[in-house]
Amino acid sequence: DKMPNNFSNICFLKLILPNAKIINACRHPLDSCISSYKQLFYKGQSWSYDLFEIGEYYLEYDRMMRHWHNLFPGEIMDFHYESVLEKQEIETKKLLDFCGLEWEEQCLKFYETKRSINTASSEQVRQPIYKGAMYAWKNYESHIGELIETLSPLLNDLNDDAKPQSLRK
């Protein structure tokens, strides 16, 4: 399940399903926030309609995920979008290993599935991995100053090529 609010339910999930493996799908903070801003969610995501609120929400998500990692060491895998784009097969094998699943060549052809998919990204699941969305936030950099400022505690820890110009030294 990839609902944006589910990170807050990890403790409950681990209580009712103690052997559950948690996969945290990660992306560059600005790309993640811009993606949420562009998506019209059904309900329960009112934070996604304002860039400042998105930034604050993302900081809370980051804080909570650090807490869950400390509370459940080795039971949460951070699956980084950018790493998957660069090394899809290697990262997919790591994911399957974490889940205790066997490798199948079809894992690289996920887009060939015939089953119904009901998510905000259902169209993306029906095509090969698209690299054009990586660092897409750079297209909006001159318009997202408030978001950059809000996320600066996280962005300052990134390599310079992943930082907004305003935060580079």
What are these regions (language model features)?
Residues N6, R27-S32, V84-E86, S116:
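Conserved nucleotide-binding/hydrolysis micro-motifs of P-loop NTPases
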Residues S36-D78, E86-K169:
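PAPS-dependent sulfotransferases, especially Golgi type II membrane carbohydrate sulfotransferases
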Residues D1-F12:
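Glycine-rich phosphate-binding loop used to anchor ATP phosphates in small-molecule kinases
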